[in-house]
Amino acid sequence: MLEKFSSKFNVLKHSTTNGLLSVQINPNDIYEAVLFVRDNIGFEILADIVCVDNLYIDKEKRFSLYYIFRKISSENLCIYIDIDINQSVKSVESIYKSANWGERECFDQFGVKFENHPNLKRILNHKDFQGYPLRKDYPITKYQVLYESDDLVGEMKNEMQRAGLASEENDEFKTKYTFLNIGPSHPATHGTIRNFVALDGEKIISCVTEIGYLHRGFEKACENHSYAQIIPYTDRLNYCSAMLNNVGYAKAVEEALGLNLPDRGIFMRVILGELARIIDHEVCLGAMFVDMGGLTNYWYLYNPRERIYNFLSKLTGARFTNSFARIGGMANDFYDGWKEELLAHLKDVEKGVDDTMILIEKNRIFLDRVQNICKINANDALSYGFSGPNLRASGVSFDLRKDKPYYYYDSFDFSVPVGSEGDIYDRMFVRFFEMRESISIIRQAIKLIPEGKISVDDKDVFLPSKDQVYSNIESLINHFKLIFDGIKLPNGHFYSASEGANGELGFFIFSNSEPNPYRVKLRPPCFYALNAFSSMVQGSLIADSILNLGSLNIIAGELDR
């Protein structure tokens, strides 16, 4: 791949870390390089765009932009460029639709400008925000209050002009159509998301999405905390499957350190991660049934979920935000009798799934609401950066557990459910079938889980036990040293991805070998799924858009960070 790329472009630097080939090129070549990567090398997905402020790094240019690409055959590629503080970059939105919001985020947080971008405006921070918060010289304690919200009329006019529904010369569209805000504080949005729609009757003609209402500055906080201190923050990303966030982040740090976990710790992560996936899907589907008036279905899914929460509470001490993973292992081992309890809970989940599917499979009212509604085809889904159940619903069989296996997933017997139409029906039923597969994986893992340690025996990574600290001076010193000095990664950038409940959960880490990460960038699957929402709902009814939003399973904590 490097040889093919080098034959076309001047490669300034290249390196390979943990299987990720990274290539530095001239900034002027970025558009042609991205086009070449898609059309000649075959990378279907632009997974993320990451900006790093080099203010305290020994680099000549102020910013570096990293473009992370993925093939559904599991290969990754990173192309990066260095640019000056006032240097603009060609937009690649016309090549990959996922670049639209990815570039907007770089502009919002760092001030990087992209030429020919169709809507270069802030996305996570509000319209009156001054400065660029992820620049190194922006103080973390500085906050800015928004006193008047954006009416979004100007953005709506631009969207309608591009669609030929409005004219630049006049504002006739304001009287021709009805305008409605769906959110940001509405029970049907399942989170703080605002969709401003233009209506012809009940049909949506155009839609503008505004996010950022739950933006807490997760990535800025990461730069000001040690690697271990970040774990509780990950719980608050996709809070419906907190354990998967813990595991995804810990996995990224461990891969950068070259750590190999004990088998029992790995199996614990598989079991608890699949439980989190089940909970997440139950929340998604149960909430959708409430939206369409199916309360019986809701309780069939929510009651077993409650029992799993009780299990997690007993194990971790917390129902919702568990903070149970550790860099190098797990916080504690399973308690006595956990297998019997968990197997009983899995039977409850299985029965709830079966009973729900019996109620809806031939229900004409249900089928009319979800079949052939808000469809997205495979090519568009890939271009928008879809992953997980939403991508598989469009007919693309891609699952990181299968295609780039980790944690012994290649030794488990499970299938990857795939849809065909990319409609609401497929997005729902892919999740139903995935719950069955997760149950199967957990049962297999319960049979196979070995005895032994749950964490690495490495004083530079994992804290000694309390018994050791209280009885051994060397352990006390190791504890003291790790707390004060922290975990230190090698210099460089690292990207790690795991299969979250909503798709590819990626963590990009830039390290300068200090106790705190120099830069952490989260790749939230929700972010790129919602980017496509506006195009998906055009021509549909208001009621359809509510179900479509639910079927994408947008979690505001992960979306806004």
Curated annotation (Swiss-Prot):
NADH dehydrogenase I subunit D: annotated segments: 176-561
Cellular component aspect of the GO annotation: NADH dehydrogenase complex; plasma membrane
Protein origin, superkingdom: Bacteria
InterPro entries hit by this protein: NADH_Q_OxRdtase_suD, NADH_quin_OxRdtase_su_C/D-like, NADH_UbQ_OxRdtase_30kDa_su, NDH-1_subunit_CD, NDH1_su_D/H, NiFe-Hase_large
UniProt xrefs under Pfam families: Complex1_30kDa, Complex1_49kDa
One Gene Ontology MF term: quinone binding
Region NADH dehydrogenase I subunit C, residue ranges: 1-152
Catalytic activity: a quinone + NADH + 5 H(+)(in) = a quinol + NAD(+) + 4 H(+)(out)
Subcellular localization: Cell inner membrane
The protein's enzyme class: translocase
Keywords on record: Cell inner membrane, Cell membrane, Membrane, Multifunctional enzyme, NAD, Quinone, Translocase, Transport, Ubiquinone
EC number: 7.1.1.-
Broad class of where this protein is predominantly found: membrane
Membrane topology: Peripheral membrane protein
Main function: NDH-1 shuttles electrons from NADH, via FMN and iron-sulfur (Fe-S) centers, to quinones in the respiratory chain. The immediate electron acceptor for the enzyme in this species is believed to be ubiquinone. Couples the redox reaction to proton translocation (for every two electrons transferred, four hydrogen ions are translocated across the cytoplasmic membrane), and thus conserves the redox energy in a proton gradient.
Assembly description: NDH-1 is composed of 13 different subunits. Subunits NuoB, CD, E, F, and G constitute the peripheral sector of the complex.
NCBIfam families xref list: PRK06075.1
PANTHER family named among the record's database cross-references: NADH DEHYDROGENASE [UBIQUINONE] IRON-SULFUR PROTEIN 2, MITOCHONDRIAL, NADH-UBIQUINONE OXIDOREDUCTASE 49 KDA SUBUNIT
Protein family (similarity comment): In the N-terminal section; belongs to the complex I 30 kDa subunit family.
Name of protein: NADH-quinone oxidoreductase subunit C/D
